[in-house]
Amino acid sequence: MRTVEEDIKSWAIDHVEKHGDKFPICPYAKKARLENQVKIVIVDKCDEFLERVCEEAGGLFQNRLKLIILACSEMEITPDTLNDYIHALNHVYVPLNTYLMASYPEDEQEEFMEGDWEPDNEFFMVLIQPFKELEDASAHLEKIGYYNNWSQEYYADTVLKRQSYRRIYGKRNEKTCKEENYEKRHKESKQKDQ
């Protein structure tokens, strides 16, 4: 029997990277894995999971990663609760260019994602990725027809949901710049008056 980490690696190689009709489930997964830009973190206790998500989300760019996958097999959180937490955390992290996405065993699979692969373990995951890079890649995939076989519901639950965070992307940085510029102008103004 595989460990949870081995399940995730097998899922990536044997399922996510495999070509479907035209494209693999994630066209960028193999390159990121081969370039060691993917980190897998196994959290043993559910009550430590969200704290660990925050730690890893805060360190995404320090480690120059394309993807961090956190997983927990202690199934003491419901899919709705996990999704609510991740939605709230995205309001904190998307302005910092970091996007979080929850995945739960009970999530419905789209037809194009179905395959023979099965995990040995039951676990839920949170995937952490750079928001801007994900948006740019998604725009490219849109142009080449990648999403054409997706159902409207799945497209809305993934792509449109992520796009809904665009309005807050960069806001924290804009506010900081405005505050710094105000302080700089205020300081210069005081110096001129003296």
Regions found by a protein language model. Give the residues of each.
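Expand to "…catalyze enediolate/carbanion chemistry for C-C bond making/breaking, isomerization
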Residues: 1-194
